[in-house]
Amino acid sequence: MSVNSRKRKVATKAAPVQSSSDEELADGLLDGILSHSEDESEDDQDAEDTDASSVIEGLSDEDFEDEEDSGDEAEEIRKQMRNLNTSGGSQQRKTRQPAHERLDDGADGELEGEEDESLKPNYTVTTDAHGQVRYLYKEIDPVYESDDSDAEATNTIGNIPLTYYDEYPHIGYDINGKKIMRPAKGEALDALLDSIDIPKGWTGLTDPQTGKPLNLSEEELDVLKRLTRNEVVEDGYDPYPEMVAYFSGKQEIMPLSAAPEPKRRFIPSKHEAKRVMKIVKAIREGRIKPYKAPEEREEDEQISYDVWADEKPRPEHSMHIPAPKLPPPGYEASYHPPPEYLPDKAEEEAWLQADEEDREKDFLPKNYEALRKVPGYETFVKERFERSLDLYLAPRVRRNRLNIDPESLLPKLPDPEDLKPFPTTCAAIFRGQEGRVRCVSVDPQGIFVASGGDDGYVRIWELLTGRQVWNAKLSDEEAVDAVQWRPTKDASVLAAASGEHVYLIVPFTLLSPDVEQSSRDVLDAGWGYATSKPSTAANGEAPKQSPGKWSRPGSRMENKGILVQIEVRSAVKIINWHRRGDYFATVSPRGQSTAVAIHTVSKHLTQLPFRRLKGIAQTAQFHPSKAIFFVATRNTIRSYDLAKQELVKILQPGAKWISSIDVHPGGDNIIVGTYDKRLLWHDLDLSNKPYKTLRFHKEAIRAVKFHQGGLPLFADASDDGSLQIFHGKVVDDLMENATIVPLKVLRGHKVKSRLGVMDLDWHPREPWCVSAGADGTLRLWN
């Protein structure tokens, strides 16, 4: 270490150790650093009491204490350090004499006579903890009493390199002007202790201002984390505040000046008229030419340069796949879209509340009066960035497009011309009914057609001529909702329903004597049974009320051919006969337990097969060859075995409201018409779900019917005023499904009060069908 000339003039020996120690203790900078004396207990970890001798020798016991006091190695280290403090200290002072003492020995005689106080040094010389020269400067009395720095600075040397203090025992000065001593370093042992027990806030760095380990607080660590994440350091700070419209934010109502407009703004300008006349006069005189012909240049003067003249076409790389193009924008992306593309408040709120992944569109259509009023697109940068990501991150695959005819993918259906005969034209119109015609039925012989309507009449017409041959009024208040011929040919019986009454009619004026007598015998056979009388209970309780009351309607009706009257508990809407003609079922949708009733003609007996029916009954149908009974509610169709009296199957058409059903003559297929405009085909052997769903009508379907004469035809009637004729081929092979082909749409009925075709029925042998409309007419289609 080099010593300047002023330091060579020191005339004394090394300064007393006691004074140096007192100054260090007075500064209070070594609190917690120095070790305890040997007389104190080893378990005491308090750093407040320090030993002066340890200060002189520069050794520290606390630096070598370990948290595990019971270990043998830690105990040996402590003993060795104490031996160094006691015995080794004197030897170290003898062997390692400070350099300033050797330099100053020869100068004692020269400086003894000098008594000038100005030449006395302002420091004392001693040794530090490592045996090196240590200069202890006197305290500096600060002149000022305040500090103008923002942060509290431990070291106040300023912005200078700390290498200037490498030759000094201190590293700077604190706020009071006192020296900040260089802390002692226990290099190996401190590193071991730090690796064992890492203090809170430890960074492993050294503070260049103080020389001590640099520890960071939780707040400082949080600031560093935010900086590394490119986040705002201060909580609650908004780097992008909303712009406050100071000048245009407030809309003024009153004008700045309310002075009336001057007259000169409403009359032509005379000065402008003079200027225009000068220009017109110059044009007329030829001095001004409105159109100046371009000068003709020779071909040699026109020189054109082809920049790509020497350019050679470069073929694309074999693995090059061009980027897919973006789809063109639609009407909703226009700055002035049509009104139907603009969302309302509810749609806008739903769009804002939905997640970005769930939104159908990435933007909300907005309307602007002019293109200059369109602001900047907010998500333009984001869209370009995502497009760039898609271009270089998404893999591209070259797919060979297959040129396939779409019609080849459709099932091969037969040509409708090959499926004839089926009805195509209207052959006859039956007029004479007042109000709506609600029901229609063709007799088993195919000669007569029966109909009923809102006027309460049952009318019978000739099928070929359309002439009305018989009628009878059943009710003055109720409409005739259902008519159905008995399906056998030996007797001609017509069942009609009006309100809560069901009438069995024999139109004897239209029948031969033999058919008339057989028809009367069928109806009179049940009078011998006392089925209409209430039954008496065995225990003497009150007799049970019969669900149906069979009686004669009266002489007036009997003269017209109405022979039997059945009274039930609720209005009847549907009548369907069993194939043998001895039973028929009625459906009353308003009834609960009496909604479905089965009537026996030969016994004049009415039975209620269901004590409790799930849902509201809509219609019922007998199986054409088995003892199975189908009951349709609004949403389901249940099939019951009447012989075993058990439920066979539940069909789930998936419709909201079933209107009508019909069973195929083979018995394995059912068609269902619904009020939600669908026609459903059910295969009973396939599934309880529909095999086919046909949507060809714009309004509700009222009735569906299969042809019962062996032709593969079925039809439906809708409120849109049309009938759909279909070809339905069913084979006995279970491996082949039914073939359904739409054939013809028949239009002719007018729609009245949103009601079109109410009912239809097929001819028993021919491909003819009869339809009943809300316009008060019947139509024959062949």
UniProtKB/Swiss-Prot annotation:
GO terms for biological process: maturation of 5.8S rRNA from tricistronic rRNA transcript (SSU-rRNA, 5.8S rRNA, LSU-rRNA); maturation of LSU-rRNA from tricistronic rRNA transcript (SSU-rRNA, 5.8S rRNA, LSU-rRNA). The lineage of its organism: Eukaryota, Fungi, Dikarya, Ascomycota, Pezizomycotina. Component of the NOP7 complex, composed of ERB1, NOP7 and YTM1. The complex is held together by ERB1, which interacts with NOP7 via its N-terminal domain and with YTM1 via a high-affinity interaction between the seven-bladed beta-propeller domains of the 2 proteins. The NOP7 complex associates with the 66S pre-ribosome. Gene3D superfamilies: YVTN repeat-like/Quinoprotein amine dehydrogenase. It is found in: Nucleus, Nucleolus; Nucleus, Nucleoplasm. Residues 1-120, 533-556 are annotated as: Disordered. Keywords: Nucleus, Repeat, Ribosome biogenesis, rRNA processing, WD repeat. WD repeats lie at residues 432-471, 475-516, 612-652, 653-692, 696-736, 752-782. Residues 39-51, 59-75, 106-117 have a biased composition (Acidic residues). The keyword rRNA processing applies. It comes from Phaeosphaeria nodorum (strain SN15 / ATCC MYA-4574 / FGSC 10173). GO terms for molecular function: ribonucleoprotein complex binding. Belongs to the WD repeat BOP1/ERB1 family. This is Ribosome biogenesis protein ERB1. GO terms for cellular component: nucleoplasm; PeBoW complex; preribosome, large subunit precursor. Its main location: nucleus. HAMAP family: BOP1. Residues 82-92 have a biased composition (Polar residues). The gene is ERB1. The keyword 4Fe-4S does not apply. Component of the NOP7 complex, which is required for maturation of the 25S and 5.8S ribosomal RNAs and formation of the 60S ribosome. InterPro entries: BOP1/Erb1, BOP1_N_dom, WD40/YVTN_repeat-like_dom_sf, WD40_repeat_CS, WD40_repeat_dom_sf, WD40_rpt.
